[in-house]
Curated annotation (Swiss-Prot):
Transmembrane segments: none annotated. Forms the fibrils of tendon, ligaments and bones. In bones the fibrils are mineralized with calcium hydroxyapatite. The modification Allysine is found at residue 84. Residues 23-79, 1118-1364 form a propeptide. It is found in: Secreted, Extracellular space, Extracellular matrix. The modification Pyrrolidone carboxylic acid is found at residues 23, 80. Residues 1-22 form the signal peptide. Its main location: secreted. This is Collagen alpha-2(I) chain. The modification 5-hydroxylysine is found at residues 175, 196, 262, 307, 352. Trimers of one alpha 2(I) and two alpha 1(I) chains. Interacts (via C-terminus) with TMEM131 (via PapD-L domain); the interaction is direct and is involved in assembly and TRAPPIII ER-to-Golgi transport complex-dependent secretion of collagen. Residues 34-44, 139-153, 736-745, 1003-1014 have a biased composition (Basic and acidic residues). Residues 26-1128 are annotated as: Disordered.
Length: 1364
């Protein structure tokens, strides 16, 4: 909407142009003048209307460097003109022919006119011949990572890997049923091996077994094919200001920008010496005739004054916009294969694999020798039924059975697995050229081609007829501001201008002495305006008076006729970079450049973080069952170890004949998961054919290119539990590597602080005033002087109102596919952001259903009333959890000390009245209650958030660029995107050093005198002339009449900042702004004091998704938009609120990661009941997450298990003293005085002690076991004496000693007792201690008694301590 000032300016422009037209008509019809001489050759006519866009030309080769451009306008000359100059005015009427005038003397050449506006582009010329390929460009910056390539074909099976390290011993199994006592048998001699039996007939498949427990998490699947492009996401929030990009090549000179806001008034500089005389001003109005002075003598010209001192450096401009993105660099050669990475953390649980084929029955093992007879024991009570034993090893393959009767036709089988992908065939031979097709329909108008290289200058054309004024072209995009030039030296005076009309010669006056500068008198009041006087006789030309003050800027006059083009000036010195111009409109997408030459191979980058897990691959074919191993003794069940490396699949066996139908076997166990097959293209579903026998393996083909990582193979059969070996010694440091190649130039460093402003230089001495020169003829009005240097950058203006969306442009052609860019370097993790402000209090959620009543506990003593907690942030409504199993009743705690009074909290909501309970006495220890019935199944949980990205796989070799695809059809017009929010203002750059002054230009040749032109319209008012010498004091004139009120002047510069005003009253609360950018994870706050339990609420509706409890247009972004209702800040506030809501949800549902740890494994199980057991991060003491610890969470029992460091104390003849038979503490005496430690990598011992203390407070049950490996040493019961005198002693955390017999609270139990007699062989005893006093664990030391002999050795394995 036009403002009042804009409307008034338009009206004045219209009136001025109308007056100018009328004045020219009157002058033309006044009198007929004589015929003039033949006029000079006219300018080239205006360009014709624009032609249709031609087809895209082939990109030409880089042209030769162009000639030096014309000198740019100095300073902010362009700022004095509007961005679009007026077109030529309408052609005037032809006046009557005047009488021939006398030929005037040819005037000297005028100043070079400013360059005219660029005309509309002409029609596109025909496409030039394809030039030779240009030189290879510089290597571009790394492109964005390309899409992952298709997985390679499956490689040849690798060799058998080395045997893995033995796993840690597992937790003890359940105690088996005691068998009946056998009769005492005599020890028989071992029998000879029996003859190998005939293979039995293969049995029929057994009934399917029960569904097995959830398997361990599968390995990360191979990356799936890229999905279809998703819909355009909403505009992201404003990112942080990126680092300044490299300085781009200088863009083409932009159109003159609109005049910027006037800068603030700069400080007054030191006065420089007088410069050379400026151009002559306009002829002033005739002055009053002064008194005739005595004639003076002409003086000689004075010497030019000394050059003024250099001014202070100007303020550096804001950083420029990032340059255009470079063309993609050439594809680098494949880097060397990186070293194998460390084993990653176990991934989340994979889905259960399908059952494998049933293995063949194993052969019957040889009978073992009978064992020694045991003493007859008391018959034990019947134990629980043990778990099914492991299946025996498969038997040898049986002979083929007799051929059965043909069976009935079976149903069609399921579709077989897809075959492996065939090798890519060689490229076919190029076929012969086809016949010419018939001419096609005329295509759509192609986009505008590239501008061709400038042609040779043609001969001057004949003067064409003056064309109609062309339609104003659309304003082009605002180009980037050119670099700011250094002010050049003041050039020589230009050639003399054309002589003006001769004035009457004034009488020569005497030169008066230079008077001192008088003080300015006070301004007189304006008198009333007098009547206009009669026109007086033209007086003699007075001396040039002092230059008047600058007038207001006049309205732009009508455009004059264009002058002849001046000679191109020499190329100026490149100036400093100017302030960045506003961003130009987005240009059309250019065609991709040709690929550059391949760059050198870059150094191998550091291993990036692992990517997100891909989808599961197809199931592979099952491998052949391996040969049976000898059955080892079953070890104790341990914690699940880290997943081992995959075994290689065996070769495929031949297909056997169909056997006789056997009896129904017992339910089989889940088969092993097959190796992943290569992803084949889906074929049509056919009926299953008979399976052919496998042919012999062909010779190994040449190694193919490295494929993408396949799925992880099957887990091989577990080997026997070995003992962990001692840690190897540290290796010698490697030799110093060769010096690497010089790295690429780093990014610009941060801007240093602005240096102090240098002191102003001293003023040069004033030159002696020269004697007055003789009076010259009055010159014509001089051309507009060069504009002054640019003022300092003004404060940024307010944001303009968004313009209406432009019409959609035509769809561009699809560009050629660029080569795949190199993988970008991995960015470093951002630092944790500051904690965000607390969110708004949520509305009260609907009440939940009443829970099932728990068993009544024994009444505890009445505790002291705790301090009221702070009002917490509203939590999101949780889903209904599974009802928990009722826990056993704990012992009553002692009366706690009264805590300090808390700060006064806000008043809470009024609770429902509670039931008055009578204070009961402290009860005795109750027996543990029975387990409650299992709760109903909860509703399925929502899909979890996307996990943290896994470690990045090894860098694959760069794929070859694909062939050029066909040109796609013209796309539909896209919708105009929403305008993005304004970017943040970048930091001010540092003050650059002053560049050297340019060399003085060569004086130009004097031009040919031109014909006298018609009298021009009055020019713009010139700049102030130099201060003249003070004239003789004139007589005081009569007071003039008051003048009419002039028009309002242009807005003055901003005044200096006034003193700060008083604080205003607090305004109304603003509307809620948009959400800001999501902050990083805030640190965990300290736990508040527990509040009193509230009454159960009424039942709520079944849980759906989380609903944010604000109704309607609470966010301003949801309200109907009006031009004044929305500000950029509002979006940030809205985004901040939404981000805070997300963060609160994250706090309420911890993820078990290092950045978002849970407090205990129980919290994780409650938040994610669908998760499986594994290693997770917890932070029992809450607060900062830097001291979070990694533990094993057993979700089946809800236990949190922490491993000892180290877990194994190696084998040794620890102690040599067979005489002193006393308990010797391993950690205190034998092991160098160090107790068992429970540390986690990255956490100090003190921090770990704090975490363990919190774990003990949070738990009400703890357990731990220790395996005592012995050779000729008694650990628990001595079989010879039948007593426990030689049993070991354990030391708990609170210095309590745990013994084999005595008080039941401090006695441990033994699960396996192999160290009960001395057999000169290694045995083991597994000791377990469970307690409902978690402060007693973990175990810190062990003291055996039966050690010290030369043949006695022990080794310890400390199991994890588990809290519940």
């Amino acid at each position: 909407m036009l403002s009042f000032v804009d409307t008034r300016t338009l009206l004045l422009l219209a009136v001025t142009s109308c007056l100018a037209t009328c004045q020219s008509l009157q002058e033309a019809t006044a009198r007929k003048g004589p015929s003039g001489d033949r006029g000079p050759r006219g300018e080239r006519g205006p360009p014709g209307p624009p032609g249709r866009d031609g087809d895209d030309g082939i990109p030409g080769p880089p042209g030769p460097p162009g000639p030096p451009g014309p000198p740019g306008l100095g300073g902010n000359f362009a700022a004095q003109f509007d961005a679009k100059g007026g077109g030529p005015g309408p052609m005037g009427l032809m006046g009557p022919r005047g009488p021939p005038g006398a030929s005037g003397a040819p005037g000297p050449q005028g100043f070079q006119g400013p360059p005219g506006e660029p005309g509309e582009p002409g029609q596109t010329g025909p496409a030039g011949a394809r030039g030779p390929p240009g030189p290879p460009g510089k290597a571009g910056e790394d492109g964005h990572p390309g899409k992952p390539g298709r997985p390679g074909e499956r490689g040849v099976v690798g060799p058998q890997g080395a045997r893995g390290f033995p796993g840690t011993p597992g937790l003890p199994g359940f105690k088996g049923i005691r068998g009946h006592n056998g009769l005492d048998g005599l020890k028989g001699q071992p029998g000879a091996p029996g003859v190998k039996g005939e293979p039995g007939a293969p049995g029929e498949n057994g009934t399917p077994g029960q569904t097995g427990a959830r398997g361990l998490p599968g390995e990360r699947g191979r990356v799936g094919a890229p999905g279809p492009a998703g819909a355009r996401g909403s505009d992201g929030s404003v990112g942080p200001v990126g680092p300044a990009g490299p300085i781009g090549s200088a863009g083409p000179p932009g159109f003159p920008g609109a005049p910027g806001p006037k800068g603030e008034l700069g400080p007054v500089g030191n006065p420089g010496p007088a410069g050379p005389a400026g151009p002559r001003g306009e002829v002033g109005l005739p002055g009053l005739s002064g008194p005739v002075g005595p004639p003076g003598n002409p003086g000689a010209n004075g010497l030019p004054g000394a050059k003024g001192a250099a001014g202070l450096p100007g303020v550096a401009g804001a950083p420029g916009l990032p340059g255009p993105r470079g063309i993609p660099g050439p594809v680098g050669a494949a880097g060397a294969t990186g070293a194998r990475g460390l084993v990653g953390e176990p991934g989340p649980a994979g889905s259960k694999g399908e059952s494998g084929n049933k293995g063949e029955p194993g052969a019957v093992g040889q009978p073992g020798p009978p064992g020694p007879s045991g003493e007859e024991g008391k018959r034990g009570s019947t134990g629980e039924i043990g778990p099914a034993g492991p299946p025996g090893p498969p038997g040898l393959r049986g002979n083929p059975g007799s051929r059965g009767l043909p069976g009935a036709d079976g149903r069609a089988g399921v579709m077989g697995p897809a075959g492996s992908r065939g090798a890519t065939g060689p490229a076919g031979v190029r076929g012969p050229n086809g016949d010419s097709g018939r001419p096609g329909e005329p295509g759509l108008m192609g986009p505008r081609g590239f501008p061709g290289s400038p042609g040779n200058i043609g001969p001057a054309g004949k003067e064409g007829p003056v064309g109609l004024p062309g339609i104003d072209g659309r304003p082009g995009p605002i180009g980037p501001a050119g670099a700011r030039g250094e002010p050049g030296n003041i050039g020589f005076p230009g050639p003399k201008g054309p002589s003006g009309d001769p004035g009457k010669a004034g009488e020569k006056g005497h030169a008066g002495l230079a008077g001192a500068r008088g003080a300015p008198g006070p301004d007189g009041n304006n008198g009333a305006q007098g009547p206009p006087g009669l026109q007086g006789v033209q007086g003699g030309k007075g001396e040039q008076g002092p230059a008047g003050p600058p007038g207001f800027q006049g309205l732009p006059g009508p455009a004059g006729t264009a002058g002849e083009a001046g000679k191109p000036g020499e190329r100026g010195i490149p100036g400093e970079f100017g302030l960045p111009g506003p961003a130009g409109a987005r240009g059309e997408r250019g065609p991709p450049g040709e690929s550059g030459a391949a760059g050198p191979t870059g150094p191998i980058g550091s291993r990036g973080p692992s990517g997100p897990p891909g989808p599961d691959g197809n199931k592979g074919e099952p491998g052949v069952v391996g040969a049976p191993g000898t059955a080892g003794p079953s070890g104790p069940s341990g914690l699940p170890g880290e997943r081992g490396a995959a075994g290689i699949p065996g070769g495929k066996g031949e297909k056997g004949e169909t056997g006789l139908r056997g009896d129904i076997g017992s339910p089989g166990r889940d088969g092993a998961r097959g190796a992943p097959g290569a992803i084949g293209a889906p074929g049509p579903a056919g009926a299953n054919g008979d399976r052919g026998e496998a042919g012999p393996a062909g010779p190994a083909g040449p190694a193919g290119p490295r494929g993408s990582p396949g799925e992880r193979g099957e887990v091989g059969p577990a080997g026997p539990n070995g003992f962990a070996g001692p840690a190897g010694a540290a290796g010698q440091p490697g030799a110093k590597g060769e010096r690497g190649t010089k790295g690429p130039k780093g990014e610009n460093g941060p801007v240093g602080p602005t240096g102090p402003v240098g002191a102003a230089g001293p003023s040069g001495p004033n030159g002696p005033p020269g004697p007055a020169g003789s009076r010259g003829d009055g010159g014509p009005p001089g051309a507009t002087g060069f504009p002054g240097a640019a003022g300092r950058t003004g404060p940024p203006g307010p944001s303009g109102i968004s313009g209406p969306p432009g019409p959609p442009g035509p769809a561009g052609k699809e560009g050629l596919r660029g080569p795949r860019g190199d993988q970008g370097p991995v960015g470093r993790s951002g630092e944790t952001g500051a904690s965000g402000p607390p969110g708004f209090v949520g509305e009260k959620g609907p009440s939940g259903e009443p829970g099932t009543a728990g068993p009544p506990g024994t009444p505890g003593p009445q505790g002291l009333l705790g301090a009221p907690g702070f009002l917490g942030l509203p939590g999101s409504r949780g889903e209904r959890g599974l009802p928990g199993v009722a826990g056993s009743v704990g012992e009553p705690g002692p009366l706690g000390i009264a805590g300090p009074p808390g700060a006064r909290g806000p008043p809470g909501n009024v609770g429902n009245p509670g039931v008055n309970g009578a204070p009961g006495e402290a009860g005795r220890d109750g027996n543990p209650g029975n387990d409650g019935p299992p709760g109903r199944d909860g509703q399925p949980g929502h899909k979890g958030e996307r996990g943290y990205p896994g470690n990045a796989g090894p860098v694959g070799a760069a794929g070859a660029p694909g062939p050029q695809g066909p040109v796609g059809p013209v796309g539909k017009h896209g919708n105009r995107g929403e305008p993005g929010p304004a970017g943040a203002v970048g930091p001010a750059g540092a003050v650059g050093p002053r560049g050297p002054s340019g060399p003085q230009g060569i004086r130009g040749d004097k031009g040919e005198p031109g014909d006298k032109g018609p009298r021009g319209l009055p020019g713009l008012k010139g700049h102030n002339g130099l201060q003249g010498l003070p004239g003789l004091a004139g007589h005081h004139g009569d007071q003039g009449a008051p003048g009419a009120v002039g028009p309002a002047g242009p807005r003055g510069p901003a005044g200096p900042s006034g003193p700060a005003g008083k604080d205003g009253r607090i305004g109304q609360p603003g509307a809620v702004g948009p959400a800001g950018i999501r902050g990083s994870q805030g640190s965990q706050g300290p736990a508040g004091p527990p509040g009193p339990p509230g009454p159960p609420g009424p039942p709520g509706p079944s849980g759906g998704g989380y609903e944010f409890g604000f109704d309607g247009d609470f966010y301003r972004a949801d309200q109907p938009r009006s031009p004044t209702s929305l500000r950029p800040k509002d979006y940030e506030v809205d985004a901040t609120l939404k981000s805070l809501n997300n963060q609160i949800e994250t706090l309420l549902t911890p993820e078990g990661s290092r950045k978002n740890p849970a407090r205990t494994c129980r919290d994780l199980r409650l938040s994610h009941p669908e998760w499986s057991s594994g290693y997770y991060w917890i932070d029992p003491n809450q607060g900062c997450t830097m001291d979070a610890i990694k533990v094993y969470c057993d979700f089946s029992t809800g236990e949190t298990c922490i491993r000892a460091q180290p877990e194994d104390i190696p084998v040794k003849n620890w102690y040599r003293n067979s005489k002193a038979k006393k308990h010797v503490w391993v950690g205190e005496t034998i092991n160098g005085g160090t107790q068992f430690e429970y540390n986690v990598e990255g956490v100090t011992t003190k921090e770990m002690a704090t975490q363990l203390a919190f774990m003990r407070l949070l738990a009400n049950h703890a357990s731990q076991n220790i395996t005592y490996h012995c050779k000729n040493s008694i650990a628990y019961m001595d079989e010879e004496t039948g007593n426990l005198k030689k049993a070991v002693i354990l030391q708990g955390s609170n210095d309590v000693e745990l013994v084999a017999e005595g008080n039941s609270r401090f006695t441990y139990t033994v699960l396996v007792d192999g160290c009960s007699k001395k057999t000169n062989e290694w045995q083991k005893t597994i000791i377990e201690y469970k307690t409902n006093k978690p402060s007693r664990l973990p175990i810190l030391d062990i003291a055996p008694l039966d050690i010290g002999g030369a043949d006695q050795e022990i080794r310890l394995n400390i199991g994890p301590v588990c809290f519940k």
